[in-house]
Regions:
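Active-site loop immediately N-terminal to the catalytic Tyr-X3-Lys motif
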Residues: 26-32, 54-55, 97, 115
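A glycine/serine/threonine-rich, flexible loop-to-helix segment
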Residues: 54, 66-93
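Active-site helix of classical SDR
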Residues: 1, 37, 45
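Active-site loop-to-helix junction immediately N-terminal to the catalytic Tyr of the SDR YXXXK motif
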Residues: 27-35, 47, 75
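A conserved structural motif in NAD(P)-dependent oxidoreductases
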Residues: 94-105
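Short C-terminal tail/terminal secondary-structure segment
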Residues: 26, 98, 109-110, 121-134
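Alpha-helical segment proximal to the catalytic Tyr-Lys
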Residues: 6, 50-54, 118
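Residue(s) in the substrate-gating loop at a strand-loop-helix junction
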Residues: 21
């Protein structure tokens, strides 16, 4: 994002949606560096929202929960776990009792970047199936 906002054409607004993690809000044992980095993304989002609003720039963040991606599938496969086992292991990691799909993470990003969210800036949207309130 460095330098991108200031170079925006004056007649066009820009929208940034940063991807953090629900663990930026909760933290976990043994994951301090990852969780702190994701919390830093939230601080950066709020700061940039303040700094860039005069340029017509909106900056928001989403905090996804566990998302069943190819990355997690390949890590599970390398550990000898089936997809069913992976899904079972994460059933308790959200109120909804399952992993998110990549599409369930993409839609809120698209919405925050759309004109329908034109009055939202500096916000954090938890897309975590309720994990952040557990």
């Amino acid at each position: 994002m460095q330098g991108g906002a200031a170079g925006a054409a004056p007649h066009r607004s820009r929208k940034y949606v940063n991807v953090s993690s629900c663990y930026a809000l909760t933290g976990r044992k043994g994951m301090g560096l990852y969780d702190a980095t994701k919390a830093g993304i939230l601080a950066m989002t709020r700061t940039l929202a303040f700094e860039e609003v005069a340029h017509g720039v909106r900056v928001n963040a989403i905090c996804p929960g566990s998302t069943l991606t190819d990355f997690h599938l390949s890590r599970g496969k390398a550990a000898g776990k089936s997809v069913a086992t992976l899904k079972t292991e994460r059933q308790t990691s959200s109120l909804l009792g399952r992993w998110a799909t990549p599409q369930e993470i993409a839609w809120p990003i698209l919405w925050l970047a759309s004109d329908e969210a034109s009055f939202i800036t500096g916000a954090m949207l938890a897309v975590d199936g309720g994990l952040s309130i557990m």
